[in-house]
């Protein structure tokens, strides 16, 4: 890459970043937080944060990258995607009407809400315990990270249930919403994330998600300023780098440490070069249509229920890894959101996917606002827990693609909804047995309340 070519890419990168950052800043000033703000920051991180890191790798360490014209296509496709997404998100197809009273879809009381978070926590803890009994601490047993996907590890499907510890702790926080509950959420979820990191053998997702949710709650409540958020972001990047070194068993120093930091940070937070690789091999792609979305559900179907289930799931990530890159190392390489759309339908699917994503984020914001307006604090805690719990799925959307997002959000919805139903069933059984007693306020306290 020549200096002139880099200068052209830098101009496009600066304009694109300024365009998205400006819209995000105005939205942040308007509402402080919604899922449009979160997705916009996530989109910036995924598709634009890595450009400076790539530039240093190219000019400092002479690392090979895709041709400049392909990198330009990747930057422009990301900017155009966001433009279509933003217009879709902001467009109203009908006038906003004043909310009229309507019969709620469901209600929650104190006992049902506490039962819900206990069930969600139980799902996570039991899954971790069973996985540990089968495999022990994989971080200290396996020699390479790719081994966690091999036949040496049993009960891999249980990992999908670990994440429900975070929504459980979110319910606990939203029932109180004070600084102590906020700090308890951080300590409990990060401790659980570190435990699963050691048991699973290097999976950092639970730690990243817990820390991100903690920061966004702090921003919403005004407990964290923007400079504190920036400092926490730097701390998070360094922490994830250290965990990555432990995961891959790397011992580096000097220039090698700096080089390792650059490429691991880029691959962890901003795999934008994967989109460039896809575009570089565009002529080799056999467009998959909507099949990757259907195939991604295969992993949630147990073999005892479907004995003939394919052992290899050809979703967009695996298609990109195996068919496009011819990489059979055992690790799936993230195609990114835009990359998954290219795999499914080429360039035509990029604006269509942007419209779909705009509607998805709009729906989550509608649900979040519903929770903000809900007078029943127990129901509000459940709605907010569901919305913030889905942040993991939004990260999957940006990094892994639309197909992975759809299967995971459906799985999350089913498990979360089933936990609600079981909680309501248990409440009905306990109430029928006379075990539920309404809280009564003592007379002196009632008199004191009246005086106040």
UniProtKB/Swiss-Prot annotation:
One record GO biological process: enterobacterial common antigen biosynthetic process
Topology versus the membrane: Multi-pass membrane protein
Key word Hydrolase present: no
Compartment list: Cell inner membrane
Origin: domain of life: Bacteria
Gene Ontology CC annotation, any one: plasma membrane
InterPro entries the UniProt entry points to: WzyE (IPR010691)
Main location: membrane
A Pfam family this chain is assigned to: WzyE
Ranges that cross the membrane: 6-26, 37-57, 63-83, 118-138, 155-175, 181-201, 207-227, 228-248, 341-361, 378-398, 410-430
The family this protein is said to belong to: Belongs to the WzyE family.
Described purpose of this protein according to its UniProt entry: Probably involved in the polymerization of enterobacterial common antigen (ECA) trisaccharide repeat units.
Subunit structure: Probably part of a complex composed of WzxE, WzyE and WzzE.
Protein name: Probable ECA polymerase
């Amino acid at each position: 890459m020549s200096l002139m070519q880099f200068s052209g890419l830098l101009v496009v990168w600066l304009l694109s970043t300024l365009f998205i950052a400006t819209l995000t800043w105005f939205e942040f000033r308007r509402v402080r937080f919604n899922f449009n703000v979160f997705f916009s920051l996530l989109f910036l991180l995924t598709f634009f944060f890595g450009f400076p890191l790539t530039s240093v790798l190219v000019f400092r360490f002479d690392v090979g990258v895709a041709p400049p014209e392909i990198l330009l296509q990747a930057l422009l496709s990301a900017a155009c995607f966001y433009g279509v997404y933003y217009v879709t998100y902001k467009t109203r197809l009908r006038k906003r009407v004043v909310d009229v009273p309507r019969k709620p879809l469901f209600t929650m009381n104190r006992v049902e809400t506490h039962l819900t978070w206990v069930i969600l926590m139980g799902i996570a803890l039991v899954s971790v315990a069973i996985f540990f009994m089968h495999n022990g601490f994989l971080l200290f047993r396996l020699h390479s990270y790719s081994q966690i996907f091999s036949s040496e590890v049993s009960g891999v499907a249980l990992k999908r249930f670990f994440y429900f510890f975070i929504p459980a702790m979110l319910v606990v926080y939203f029932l109180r919403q004070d600084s102590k509950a906020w700090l308890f959420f951080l300590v409990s979820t990060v401790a659980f994330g570190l435990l699963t990191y050691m048991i699973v053998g290097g999976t950092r997702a639970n730690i990243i998600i817990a820390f991100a949710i903690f920061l966004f709650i702090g921003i919403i409540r005004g407990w964290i300023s923007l400079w504190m958020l920036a400092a926490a972001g730097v701390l998070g990047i360094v922490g994830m780098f250290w965990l990555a070194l432990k995961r891959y068993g790397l011992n580096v120093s000097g220039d090698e440490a700096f080089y390792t930091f650059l490429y691991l940070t880029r691959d962890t937070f901003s795999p934008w070069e994967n989109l460039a690789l896809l575009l570089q091999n565009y002529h080799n792609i056999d467009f998959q249509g909507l099949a990757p979305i259907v195939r991604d559900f295969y992993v949630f179907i147990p073999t005892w229920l479907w004995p003939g289930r394919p052992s290899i799931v050809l979703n967009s990530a695996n298609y990109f890894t195996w068919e496009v890159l011819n990489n059979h190392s055992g690790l799936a390489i993230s195609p990114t959101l835009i990359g998954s759309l290219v795999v499914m339908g080429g360039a035509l699917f990029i604006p269509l996917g942007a419209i779909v994503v705009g509607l998805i984020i709009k729906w989550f914001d509608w649900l979040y606002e519903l929770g903000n307006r809900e007078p029943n604090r127990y129901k509000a805690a459940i709605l907010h827990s569901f919305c913030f719990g889905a942040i993991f799925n939004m990260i999957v959307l940006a990094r892994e693609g639309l197909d992975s997002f759809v299967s995971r959000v459906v799985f999350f919805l089913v498990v979360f909804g089933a936990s609600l139903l079981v909680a309501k069933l248990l409440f009905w059984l306990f109430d029928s047995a006379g075990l539920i007693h309404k809280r009564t306020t003592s007379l002196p306290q009632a008199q004191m309340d009246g005086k106040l």
